[in-house]
Every structure is written in structure tokens, then in C-alpha cells.
């Protein structure tokens, strides 16, 4: 229409060139770099479309059928789809898909099942846990008496005997099983037995491995835990957000009240639409094939790195992530993160268990295969990426501030690799 309101017709490029320019530069970065950050992935065009939809306009405080605003008929439809699909994926009786993030999901569980001052037992951040599991800077470390378990110095594996001893000693009301940098499977049955022995509730934070569990390649924590939290991105390959699952109806009621009105107001309906799409994708056989490739690619990348002279914490991986110990190369995590980014490879510096370096320096990096696998990389491509990473490592040993020639050459090879597997 010739008299159309430009507010509704002008594109982002026409209305705000500065923001559009930044987005285009980020798109180019994602297209031309290899993403190895283990907590990142690449969503489908369908998820992008859902998250950029008119649902961003809709306030929908409450839950389907029980909203505090009118006009929620179709918001209800979208949220019901998300709930039904995620329940089907994980064989759960109840689901809340409104948490804006994994941290919000974890906070909701703590609000529902613990009181300020209660003891909470979780994995320490320096052993591979997450901030929200009782780290001192986080709310969970300030409002609760946070006791932390770790890993064995000999094996770098979770010390379940220590977990049990700490539980018996401190009698927590909530035990948390989950991680942000732990490459091995979790024994949910053992965690539940420990929780039952002291009358604690067990919360599993499956954020990193939700996709692996969805594909049936890891035990399902819903069968063991009182409550399960997760993000919707990472291996599940959805938009950034969270959700909570339980088979206990009374806990489900408490969780719903904790999410709204306890922690949040209106849900982000456009994000919930993206979640619904991603959950639908996770129910397909193609998704199971994808996860199998994620796991195989992690093995391929790890094999190359080990052969090249670095150590992998625990000696390898059972999932999508690798925790790389750089000490055999005499390198630091921050130094390597920066050099790899200059070379077209993004990862993050990460402490290793019993690390002597500061968190801003670290002795390790964390790598993951979900994003590269999404864009189509197979084992051959990840072996090539591993070879290029080792070249950057070895150049840093000679030139600790960075070897420009090596980094530029690697960057060209990475760019050529990415061009073979385009995104968007």
C-alpha cells in the first residue's frame, strides 16, 4: 500500500543501519569462523523465524488457560506445543518452558525446594561445575550454605564417595548433579541414592548434555531426579532459554509458582515459539544422527590433540566437550583463546581441576563439537581443525605473544573450510 505506515514497513537496514551493520558483522563472523565453544550451537532457520515473530509483542503472564491478560489464545497454543514436545522428548510428566535461561531454571528450583540458609551440595566451579550450583559470587552461593564436591586428583572423575561423605556430614536439603566443564557421564542413580540417604531432593542440571540425552545416548535423569533443569541451546540446538522437568505433581506446582510469579513476570513467547520448534526437531531421527556425529567428532578431535602432545582431562570424553590441559605445551588458556580467535577458531579459556592459574588466565581451554557438526563437519573436518589448532599451539611456544604468519595462514585454511559448509 502506498500509504503504509513506515513503522511497519521499513526494514532494519532502512531504520537502523548501525544495529544492522553490527548484526551483519556477527553473521559474517559466524559464517567464516569455526565455533568450538562447547555451550554454543547454530539454530535452524525455522527457529530464527519463530523467535523473530510477532509473538514478541504478546504479554502472557500465567500459564496456558490461566493467563492474566486477554488475547492469549495463540500464545497458549504455542506454549502447549512446547510443553507437550519436551515432555515427550524426556518422558516427563510435567514441564515448565518459561524460564528465560538455565540460571533462571536453577533459581526457580532453589526457590521452590530450599529456603535461604539451607545447605545445598553442588559441584565446585573449579572442578567443572557451574556458577549457579553454589559458587560464592552467585545468588546460590549467597543465599544458601553452599557445600561443594569435586573430582579425584588421580582420575579427575567425580568422587562419589566424597559426595556421599559431604552429604552425610552436612545434610543438604538439595543436591545438584550437573556441570559446565566435565567430559564424562554422570551416575544419576548413585546421586539419587546419596540424596535419599540424607532426605535431600536431587536436582540434575542437564544443560550441556540435554541433546545427548534426548537422542538416547546418555541415561535420562528424569528417571532418577526429583527435578531436572536445562537450557534449550547447547546440544539441544534451540534458542537461548531454559526449562524444568519433573514427574512429581507437587514439585511441579511449586516450580510453576517459583517461575511465575516467584522469579519472572511475562514469559518470552517468541522464545517459547523457538523452543517449540527446536523440541520438534529433537524428536526426529535426523537429530539422533546429528548427536551421534557430535559424539564421534569429539572423539576425532580429541584423538588428534592427544597425539599432538596435549593432555585431555580424564583422558578423553563421553560427550560433546573436551577439556584440554595445555601445561604439556607450556601454554595458558587466555593466551591460546586469543591466538585461536585470531586464527578463525573460537573457544574459551577454562580452568582445569586443581588449576594453579587464576580464572582469568587458566591452564586449559574447553572445546566442543556441536556447532561445527551442525554446519556439516564430520570426523575428517574435525581432524583437520585439530591439526590447525596444534599448529597454533606450536607457534605460540616459539612466539608467546602470537605468530602472525602462522595465525594468518591458519585463518585462510579455516575460511576455506567454512566456505565448504555455509550457514544461512
Swiss-Prot record:
Cofactor(s) essential for the protein: pyridoxal 5'-phosphate
Enzyme Commission number(s) of this protein: 2.1.2.1
Free-text function comment from the UniProt entry: Catalyzes the reversible interconversion of serine and glycine with tetrahydrofolate (THF) serving as the one-carbon carrier. This reaction serves as the major source of one-carbon groups required for the biosynthesis of purines, thymidylate, methionine, and other important biomolecules. Also exhibits THF-independent aldolase activity toward beta-hydroxyamino acids, producing glycine and aldehydes, via a retro-aldol mechanism.
Name recorded for this polypeptide: Serine hydroxymethyltransferase 2
Residues at which (6S)-5,6,7,8-tetrahydrofolate binds: 125, 129-131, 250
Site (Plays an important role in substrate specificity): 233
PTM sites of type N6-(pyridoxal phosphate)lysine: 234
Main location: cytoplasm
Enzymatic reactions: (6R)-5,10-methylene-5,6,7,8-tetrahydrofolate + glycine + H2O = (6S)-5,6,7,8-tetrahydrofolate + L-serine
Domain of life (superkingdom): Bacteria
Gene3D superfamilies assigned to the protein according to its UniProt record, in alphabetical order: Aspartate Aminotransferase, domain 1, Type I PLP-dependent aspartate aminotransferase-like (Major domain)
Family designation: Belongs to the SHMT family.
CC annotations in GO: cytosol
